[in-house]
Amino acid sequence: MSDFLGIDTSNYTTSAAIYESPHNVLLQEKMLLPVKKGEKGIRQSDAVFHHTVQLPEIIDKLFKKTGKRDISAVGVSYAPRRLEGSYMPCFLTGISAATAVSRALSVPLYRFSHQEGHIAAALYSAGRLELLNEPFIAFHVSGGTTEAVLVNPDNEHIINAEIVASSSDLKAGQAIDRVGVMLSLNFPAGPELERLSEKSNAVFKIKPSMKNADCSLSGVENKCKKMLTENYEKSDIALFCIDSVIAALDGMYKALMPKYGALPVVFSGGVTSNKRIKNYFHDKYNAVFAEPAFSADNAAGTAVLSSIMYDRRK
């Protein structure tokens, strides 16, 4: 047996994946949770309900795609981060399903944080899993998180992630979604905001709001509101929002370099699927990015991590 099932039930996406270890092939299915037009998020009770409805459908689609599999182990996201007090009810849906599969098949169940899954998915899709054997800086940039973590190899959990920089208020994905909704785009607004920004030729010189290595993004939403009342083109507002996120992330990394040096830098999370963000940091720092299918929330990382954990514990 050499197939590994990953499950992730994050705040906005129901995901499942199968990792074929010998062939390094990963197949996945995922489905966004429904968010009403004009809303800026979803309540946890609604997220749990929709995951409960969608997860069986996702797993059914996955196994119709892969055919019958001999599952060696199951990996699941249990919390946003591997920190005491890190908790969201939406992950309970995935834990319940993963536990049932594990017990029914008499195979191991491994628990990973949602953040660890993002990092592993980025490394897998970029062909850089060897970085798990050395220190590196990982940015996790999404609607729920805007953090830089120092990642060190860990014998027990594979990934040891220490937060070294973060946003002190609004997260990058929140800023993008709020500005997107402000511009009458659908939630989550990232893809539509990116397409809108590509229509702009504006050039902005943006100074990020920083305190040491931490950034503040609340001013981005306020500035975009002001631009809208001043009748700026919506495409220019969209570009300003994205460039403000770039400036903040760049400020965070620059502040970390004197202490940690030029460690490899990895970007994960839905926000990092933005082509402008990817091109900026790849060109400037040779940063490692997840492929678009592995940037947004997914179960690929937990499937890959469960394979690594299984091999370690043989």
Report residues per predicted region:
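Glycine-rich beta-strand-to-loop/alpha-helix junction loops that act as flexible
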Residues: V76-A79, S142, V266-N274
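A contiguous, well-structured pocket-lining segment that forms one wall/lid of small-molecule binding clefts
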Residues: P191-V265, V271-H282, N286-V288, S307-K314
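Conserved phosphate-binding catalytic cores of ATP/NTP-utilizing and phosphoryl-transfer enzymes
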Residues: M1-S2, V107-I137, V304-L305
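Short glycine-rich, Thr/Ser-proximal phosphate-binding strand/loop in the N-terminal lobe
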Residues: S10-F49, H157-I163, F289
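Short beta-strand-loop/turn "lid" adjacent to the catalytic site in phosphate-handling enzymes
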Residues: D60-T99, R103
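A short helix-loop
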Residues: S2, T9-S10, L27-Q28, E130-E134, ...
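Short, well-ordered amphipathic alpha-helical segments that serve as non-catalytic structural scaffolds
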Residues: M31, H50-T66, A248-M252
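Glycine-rich phosphate-binding/hydrolytic loop that grips phosphoryl groups
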Residues: H118-A122, A290-K314
